[in-house]
């Protein structure tokens, strides 16, 4: 599976050089040149940071029958076994990565991470899967199970619905 987050480096050796301003208004072109040179180090850590967040899901089940990590692995495995491409499988793997950080808006954490490197369809699917999934249980908790209908005109409605039915249930 290709790494979608850039190449990984030894980020244990971060450069010590730092900009000198105390507010953006005081910053200089030299400060920003330094920051832009070093931003690659931060970008190189994205994959490791995502894997760390994914591993943390193993510590929480939230009352569900399996841990959030097991669920993520099951979702990705189902998608892979169904012949989905690598990008889709990665989306399936990390779609709930924000669950322990922001349970009620977790889809937006994963979709924000993925947006620069995935298709529009996959981004929409990850961003909206929580609302689409609500169709199957929101009526049990006093919410509108048909909230997903607000996206009925989206070209990705069926795509996202299929993700929830086949892989994220």
Locations of regions flagged by a protein language model:
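Metal-dependent phosphohydrolase cores
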Residues: 2-93, 97-169
């Amino acid at each position: 599976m290709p790494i979608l987050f850039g190449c990984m480096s030894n980020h244990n050796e971060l450069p010590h050089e730092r900009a000198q301003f105390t507010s953006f208004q005081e910053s200089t072109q030299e400060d920003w040149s330094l920051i832009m040179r070093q931003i690659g180090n931060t970008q190189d850590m994205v994959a490791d940071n995502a894997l760390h967040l994914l591993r943390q899901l193993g510590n929480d089940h939230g009352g569900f029958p399996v841990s959030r990590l097991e669920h993520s692995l099951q979702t990705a495995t189902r998608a892979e076994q169904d012949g989905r491409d690598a990008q889709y499988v990665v989306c399936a793997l990390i779609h709930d990565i924000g669950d322990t950080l922001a349970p009620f808006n977790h889809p937006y954490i994963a979709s924000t991470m993925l947006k620069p490197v995935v298709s529009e369809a996959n981004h929409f699917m990850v961003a909206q899967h929580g609302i689409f999934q609500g169709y199957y249980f929101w009526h049990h908790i006093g919410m509108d199970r048909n909230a997903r209908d607000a996206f009925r005109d989206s070209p990705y409605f069926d795509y996202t619905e299929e993700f929830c039915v086949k892989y994220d249930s």
